[in-house]
Amino acid sequence: MERYVEVGNTPVIELSNKLYGKLESVNPGGSIKDRPVKYILDRMNPQPGETIVEATSGNTGISLAMMCAERGLKCIIVMPSNMSEERKTLLRMFGAELIEVEPGDFERAIEIKDDIVSEGKGQSLHQFTNPLNIECHREELFNELRISSYMIGDI
């Protein structure tokens, strides 16, 4: 089974009396960012061999690199050079090409991503401006919480 299919349906845990949370760290990429990446990629429907490029400081990039690898997509991640070596290692492990910009210069990372897209060399999730990012959480998390509420009781 493909890992990206396993995104979501994370456990609900009780944090304190009547306060519950979703344990998003059990997603395949280890974070809640797996949800919007999968949701947006599913709607973009890129074909194997196509390139996806994103400016990111970490977790979205890791999720994207993982899912691109499984779908046969090329992945380019643009990020400031001061991001952790562990993140960079994970990105490369999943086969992503990494373009580093000056430390802390996230605006430049976005510019480079936009240049690659405008040159027709890749598509982007546009994670910061894409309404699907919010829709994903509203649709999927709401449904999971509604189902969990029914199973657990009044949460």
Name each region found by the language model:
Residues M1-I155:
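PLP-dependent amino-acid enzyme catalytic core
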